[in-house]
């Protein structure tokens, strides 16, 4: 691969930072050699009702996996995100809402957020919600989504958010698994100029005979569209909040009380309910937000994720608000009504920190300068990437085109299961290499192991990425199935948390995520991460996006099957076919040359923008009779089109 360029820490960032390199090294050293002392001190980043005296009781031992942090302390999440800021910054903006339509926006100050959250907390109590009950949110990206989350935490209810794009079947499955008591939804959502039938989907989900626990559906009026109404079950948000008090004392919660359940699709079978608890999660969300984004008071932070994903939980709602930040909640999509929408929002709200996904970056990159037309983005100070490894070409484009070569990029690696960011640069401390997530955050001990579970001690190495010890934000269990938790994360490599990802570590100790371990190809005895070949393909000037899967090959073991999407205005030709193969040969070597090039207009993606490689593997091998769980697909029609194209390739 082409040698990565190194971007040193910028002097202006270093001058006003929470952690320069010396500070990072000292803090990191303490965090791994004396985690008790480190987290005893930094656990105080949040306000405790009853201070903790126990810091860490954790075990990764087979049959005894047990994770507890700060367990004798008590606190309340909503009080940390709202109440503690009221005296000093009650009139400061907490949430900026930017609607799908660029003309729609509004703000909520911390004082206003307090009132809204207290009201809705009391409304939930009126609907019979008690401490420990599960509340399911199926909401559009409106401020009320954050209000509902915070209200649940205020009264000690456990929220489970289902992304508003999921089908009624997927919603029903999550309601059944979580035993939710109440659903909070809207009449309709709005996304990319189209209405999303949220209430209709809830009605349909609740016709499933297995759904037995729902007593009420609270409906926020977003569009005023026509909906069916069930008199004894359905309640309007505005009516429920009109007649209640706007004072609601926060419930005192134990650190290990459940905070939320968030479902991730397992590659087989039913989705896993990832359970996070109150104290450790909030400490870790607060700490990572402060240091990773180097947040300074008064700055405007924009995480483009939906609240239905872990990124939306941790870095749109809880992390920013616990730090008293100003956070943007965006209803729309980055390219509607035009390609420069993301840049326009940055200018309109003078965004200082932007956190988005490689999928969005690549989609904008394919449109070239249209993505920044009529904007200057001069307010940006820090930019971030999340969701999957970002290929160096997209990193460079993001850095130069969106960020004007002024803003360091924090390429963050983490998972739903980890609660917060685990491997990341710190803006004032870390020299950057495009495509590398760089170094571990405080308290995180990554290691690379071979397939037998032996830790690879060499500095420069490649292997399976594991974490050797617990950190406060770690998930505690799979809801209702602790055995599945142990089986999934701790049985592959004994005594270690297995991330499911492969990585390489370079001579500077920087980590490069190579993709899911099941995305590792073995071609003629050579192990290759699919991410590396995809990066080489996307570096070609005519290619917008690529996905690589392995297919069985009689001689080589595996052959390389490449799905390739071209930039707007480019079309597949025999010349381009040869050119692309030669390009990969030059970038990586003959061993990485794709055996099959499958040109296509679109790849199957989850609604959070991840490419569903499992489906691509099945299509490539012709095994399309059972595609498994496809409920998370953004556009299921893409799959049929790919199957038809594959038939023509043969």
UniProtKB/Swiss-Prot annotation:
Post-translational modification: Acetylated. Deacetylation by the SIR2-homolog deacetylase activates the enzyme.
Annotated InterPro entries: Ac_CoA_lig, ACAS_N, AMP-bd_C, AMP-bd_C_sf, AMP-binding_CS, AMP-dep_synth/lig_dom, ANL_N_sf
Residues involved in Mg(2+) binding: 538, 540, 543
Family assignment from sequence similarity: Belongs to the ATP-dependent AMP-binding enzyme family.
PANTHER family listed in its UniProt record: ACETYL-COENZYME A SYNTHETASE (PTHR24095:SF243)
Annotated function: Catalyzes the conversion of acetate into acetyl-CoA (AcCoA), an essential intermediate at the junction of anabolic and catabolic pathways. AcsA undergoes a two-step reaction. In the first half reaction, AcsA combines acetate with ATP to form acetyl-adenylate (AcAMP) intermediate. In the second half reaction, it can then transfer the acetyl group from AcAMP to the sulfhydryl group of CoA, forming the product AcCoA.
Protein name per Swiss-Prot or TrEMBL: Acetyl-coenzyme A synthetase
Taxonomic path: Bacteria, Pseudomonadati, Pseudomonadota, Gammaproteobacteria, Vibrionales
């Amino acid at each position: 691969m082409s040698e990565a360029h190194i971007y040193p820490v910028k002097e202006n960032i270093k001058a006003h930072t929470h952690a320069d390199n010396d500070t990072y090294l000292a803090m990191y050293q303490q965090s791994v050699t004396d985690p008790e002392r480190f987290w005893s001190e930094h656990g105080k980043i949040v306000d405790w009702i009853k201070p903790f005296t126990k810091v860490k009781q954790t075990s990764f031992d087979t049959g005894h996996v047990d994770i507890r942090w700060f367990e004798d302390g008590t606190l309340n999440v909503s009080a940390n995100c709202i109440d503690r800021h009221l005296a000093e910054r009650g009139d400061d903006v907490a949430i900026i809402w930017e609607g799908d339509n660029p003309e729609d926006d509004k703000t909520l100050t911390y004082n206003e957020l307090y009132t809204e959250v207290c009201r809705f907390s009391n409304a939930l109590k009126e609907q019979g919600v008690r401490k420990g009950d599960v509340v399911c949110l199926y909401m559009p990206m409106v401020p009320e989504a954050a209000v509902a989350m915070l209200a649940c935490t205020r009264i000690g209810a456990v929220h489970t958010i289902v992304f508003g794009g999921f089908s009624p079947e997927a919603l029903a499955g999550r309601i059944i698994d979580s035993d939710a008591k109440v659903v909070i939804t809207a009449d309709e959502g709005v996304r990319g100029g189209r209405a999303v039938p949220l209430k209709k989907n809830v009605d349909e989900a609740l016709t499933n005979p297995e759904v037995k626990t729902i007593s009420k559906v609270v409906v926020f009026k977003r569009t005023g569209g026509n909906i069916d109404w069930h008199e004894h079950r359905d309640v309007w948000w505005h009516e429920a909040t009109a007649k209640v008090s706007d004072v609601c004392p926060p419930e005192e919660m134990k650190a290990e009380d459940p905070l939320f359940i968030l479902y991730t699709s397992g590659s087989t079978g039913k989705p896993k309910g990832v359970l996070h608890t109150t104290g450790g999660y909030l400490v870790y969300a607060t700490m990572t937000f402060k240091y990773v984004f180097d947040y300074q008071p008064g700055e405007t932070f924009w995480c483009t994720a939906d609240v239905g994903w872990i990124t939306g939980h941790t870095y749109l709602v809880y992390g920013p608000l616990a730090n008293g930040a100003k956070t943007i909640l965006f209803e729309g999509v980055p390219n509607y009504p035009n390609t420069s929408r993301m840049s326009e929002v940055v200018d309109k709200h003078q965004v200082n920190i932007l956190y988005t996904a490689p999928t969005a970056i690549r989609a904008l990159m394919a449109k070239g300068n249209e993505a920044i037309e009529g904007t200057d983005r001069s307010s940006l100070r820090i930019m971030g990437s999340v969701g999957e490894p970002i290929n160096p070409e997209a990193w460079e484009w993001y850095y130069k085109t969106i960020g004007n070569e002024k803003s360091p990029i924090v390429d963050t690696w983490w998972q739903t299961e980890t609660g917060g960011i685990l491997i990341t640069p710190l803006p004032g401390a870390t020299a950057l290499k495009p495509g590398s997530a760089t170094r571990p955050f405080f308290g995180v001990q990554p290691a690379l192991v071979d397939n037998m579970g032996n830790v690879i001690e060499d500095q420069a190495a490649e292997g399976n990425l594991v974490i050797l010890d617990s950190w406060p934000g770690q998930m505690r269990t799979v809801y209702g199935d602790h055995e599945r938790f142990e089986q999934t994360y701790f049985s592959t490599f004994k005594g270690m948390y297995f991330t499911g990802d492969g990585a390489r570590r370079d001579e500077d100790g920087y980590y490069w995520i190579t993709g899911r371990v099941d995305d590792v190809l073995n071609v003629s005895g050579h192990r290759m991460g699919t991410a590396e070949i995809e990066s080489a393909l996307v570096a070609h000037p005519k290619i917008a996006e690529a996905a690589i899967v392995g297919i069985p090959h009689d001689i080589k073991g595996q052959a390389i099957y490449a799905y390739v999407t071209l930039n707007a205005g480019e079309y597949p030709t025999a010349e381009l076919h040869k050119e692309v193969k030669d390009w990969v040969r030059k970038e990586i070597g003959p061993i990485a040359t794709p055996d099959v090039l499958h040109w296509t207009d679109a790849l199957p993606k989850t609604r959070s923008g991840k490419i569903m490689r499992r489906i691509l593997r099945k299509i490539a091998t012709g095994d399309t009779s059972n595609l498994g769980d496809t409920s998370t697909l953004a556009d299921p029609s893409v799959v049929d089109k790919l199957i038809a194209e594959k038939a023509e390739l043969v």
